[in-house]
Amino acid sequence: TTKYEKLQSDYNELKKFTNVSKNKLNIIDYLNTNLSCKEFDFNDFCKSISLNFCNSYLDIIFKNDYVIGVSQIIINEIEKIKLENIYNLPIYAFNHKDGILYIYDNTIFSWIQINDKYLKTLIKEVSKNLLKAFLIWKNENETHFLQEQFSEIYVLNMKKVIGNNFDNRNKDIMIKNHIYKHIKVSIKNIFEIN
C-alpha cells in the first residue's frame, strides 16, 4: 500500500502542476512569439475563399445544409493552406478552450480571439460566393426540369443556400463550432509545432 500511496501522491502532484501550467499558458502570446502570418493573414484567407471558390462547393450545400456546408467549405480552404505551408495558417484552435478560434490580423500585427465581426466577415465571404454560384446553377438548370419540378428543387436548394432554417446568431456559432472541432489541436502539441 505504500507504493500505491506514493504513486497516488505523485499523480496528485503532477495533476496540480498540469492545471497550474495550463492556466498560465497564454495562447496569444505563444502564437505571437512563434507564428507570424504577416504574408497571409485572416483577411487574406477570407479573400482566398473567393479566389478558390468552385462549383462543387454548391453541391456540398445541396447535399447537406447551410451550417454543415459553409463549415465544410471553410475547412476545405484551411486544409489547402495546411498542405501548402502549415506556418502560413492564420487560424488556429486548441482543445484547452472550447469553441475559441484564434486568428492573425495584419492590421494590428497580432493574433486575437475571433470575434463576431471577423466571424461574420468569413461567413459572408462564403455566402456571397454561394449566392453567385446558385444564380449560375439556376440559369443552367431551369430548362432541364419541368416547371413544377424545378420550382420544388429551386425552393429547397435556395433555403439551404441562404440558411433559412437557422436564426442568424445560432448558425454563425454553429459554423464556428464545426470549424473548431475540425481544426483544434491538443495543447500538448503546441510545443511540437516548432
Predicted region positions:
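Heptad-repeat coiled-coil/leucine-zipper oligomerization helices
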Residues: 1-20
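Extended amphipathic coiled-coil helices
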Residues: 22-194
